[in-house]
Amino acid sequence: MGGCGSADSWVEAAPAQGWPAQYGDAANSSYTTTNGATNLTLRWTRSVKGSLAAGPALSARGYLALNGQTPAGCSLMEWQNDNNGRQRWCVRLVQGGGFAGPLFDGFDNLYVGQPGAIISFPPTQWTRWRQPVIGMPSTPRFLGHGRLLVSTHLGQLLVFDTRRGMVVGSPVDLVDGIDPTDATRGLADCAPARPGCPVAAAPAFSSVNGTVVVSVWQPGEPAAKLVGLKYHAEQLVREWTSDAVSAGVLASPVLSADGSTVYVNGRDHRLWALNAADGKAKWSAPLGFLAQTPPALTPHGLIVSGGGPDTALAAFRDAGDHAEGAWRRDDVTALSTASLAGTGVGYTVISGPNHDGTPGLSLLVFDPANGHTVNSYPLPGATGYPVGVSVGNDRRVVTATSDGQVYSFAP
């Protein structure tokens, strides 16, 4: 039995080498080491025949997964990104959790929540395992060593063994007085981040130091606060609660590459940096707009502001006790979180050009060093708002809208 040591770590589930989930990685950095393409061609478009509130997940093999909300028929879909969006399989999940996206592992298994359960699917549509949880899981996160972090909108945090689907350690409940039998309570408040949904956004995790950060809007409190936990020896332990952002935080937090700093939007129209060890404020910088999606972050410390209506596109550098403005584009309205690919390419979805009397949407390719436009590609017939940009390890770029339209570009 001595031969059964840690050499079998390759069989443990880990994030796919693509864009495994919304915001790219467990830290929510929206960054990939893949060098992004600047010249793209629109290869295919397709509709989920419903709505979307989370971005596409991309596996290393070119599979694409979407958690749609549809009036009938399939809602969770897996398509072939490199084959004109051809459907591989689809199933119908319990509806109401569209704000949470699926997660791919390196074996093309999928992990996704529905109200009251977390489910894993193999590369075919048959269920690998399904386990009950209290509430609706947000986009899951890998913790390393085949462990999965599941955080629900009602404040339950659990760690699962991805192979067997069993809970490891003890769950942590961040919100008191929750009815465990009502998995859908407050779900309608999650996408707009209103107080009825205590945990409206996915947590951030750093594998460097085991830090988990999640935003929690406790019942009866005026605003959402950040809560910090440590994952150690297969157990989550609550470490701190921060009210540094007194106006409340909005959207998922983002952890720096070294796990030392949390970046988050404030409802006070500022970008905040907090110490990940204790939740104390390091600095805040005025954005001049309300960012409704998380910032993006390179390993070298460039921070690109989140998106939303009436925004600009702005970048900062963390100078320790203050932020230095890197550049700002007031001429574009960034509607989604930027996705940063390698050293020299960023993507976001912006408003315009106008089309048939509607505002229209375009995929903007920009240089993160200075914000300059490299290319711009209109999204034909796009309506609603964008739900993010995903960058595959084959350099294909996929974006989608809240009205269920999916656009796939190739270099």
From Swiss-Prot:
Disulfides per UniProt: none
Gene3D superfamilies referenced in this protein's UniProt entry, alphabetically: YVTN repeat-like/Quinoprotein amine dehydrogenase
InterPro entries: PQQ_rpt_dom, Quinoprotein_ADH-like_sf, WD40/YVTN_repeat-like_dom_sf
Matches recorded under Pfam families: PQQ_2 (PF13360)
Protein name: Protein Rv3035
Organism listed in the record: Mycobacterium tuberculosis (strain ATCC 25618 / H37Rv)
